[in-house]
Amino acid sequence: KYSNDFGFIGFYIVKPEFRNYGNIAYMLGRHALEYLNGCNIGLDGVLERVENYKKLGFKYSHKNIRFKGFFDKKGEYSIDKNISSFNKEDCKEIIAYDRLCFPSKRTTFLKNWLNKGTNTQYFYKSSSGAIEGMGMIRQCFNGNKIGPLFADNFDIAEKLFLSLIIGRKGPVYLDIPETNENALMLVEKYNMKQCFATARMYSESIPKLKNKRIYGITTFELG
């Protein structure tokens, strides 16, 4: 639960050996829905289960698509002069920028996400010092995942993307919304290949966000 009016359901998984044992999946889902009662609830569901989620009252918004690429053998990329690492003094502005691209203010989450040791965070600032983009990458069990990647335009998103992949070994994953054509251009330009997709759905109204700034969502599991 991010606020009193928005929450997100993720990690909705039951081990295969228990899937036909009792009503575990049903009870997990019911508990999540009861906990988030009164909220607009978001989720990224597997495409095969869309009709099941519709029966629970969820509305289809769009597909989020995971792309995979390899960059450790393609030379070094430079960091643009307008890109800087996380500075606590910028925290309020970062939270405000994030809110343009996410259905709820998520102050506590971002403070933890920004300070996680294995994450690398970069921010793009204009000549006046205003934040015009933000991107983070984290090491995973298999490779690295970028998320979020928000930017005012393609040029800024690309500069952040290139900064984030510097020195990263193994696969790099980026989860993009199909609603942003420029995000599709970015993954095509760097020869990333689609490997998975989900359906973004909401229990109530579909949030009005700055979709053209969303070049990569944070995670499938947390929104």
Summary of predicted features, one role per range:
Residues F70-K88:
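Conserved N-terminal entry element of GNAT/NAT acetyltransferase domains
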Residues D5, K15-Y21, R30-N40, S85-G223:
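Intrinsically disordered, low-complexity, positively biased terminal segments
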